[in-house]
Amino acid sequence: MNDKKTSVRTLTMLALLVAMSIVFSRVLSISTGFVRFNLGSLPVLLAAVVFGPGAGFAVGAVADIIGGVLAGYAINPLITLGAGAIGLVAGFAWQKLNRLSTNLRLAASVLLGHFVGSIVITSLALRLFYGYPWATLAVRIPNALILSAVNVVLLRILLENRSLMKLAKK
């Protein structure tokens, strides 16, 4: 019975993180055409660090699908894969880099997640499906670096919140 309660609690927390990701990426977003500045990956990264790589992938992919449907976009599986890969890669990196200090571990996990998910996979999808030129896609690199830095700072604050961590670990 305790496993069922934990499972329901975990699913509820992940669903809240999906909702937060949708709001952060679709509503609280600054768009410049081909680059969007938003914190939609923050809940994805939080899920990856707290609940593991599978949860990070699920939150990223589900938030991308639901957010795309709500915005009226056609679902692009490669872009959805990129959104999920941010959480998957960050979660695996967080687990494997456990000998590093927390700050360095967090920075490396977030940077690797954004590099694979946003810079590589999503940029490739934008090039293949929508014909974006590589030169235009290069602007995504500083965007990912800035968002990674902001995400690291915010994640560090969230991970130090005892109430949040107690709620997540129950």
Label every PLM stretch briefly.
Residues 1-170:
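Loop-helix junctions at membrane interfaces
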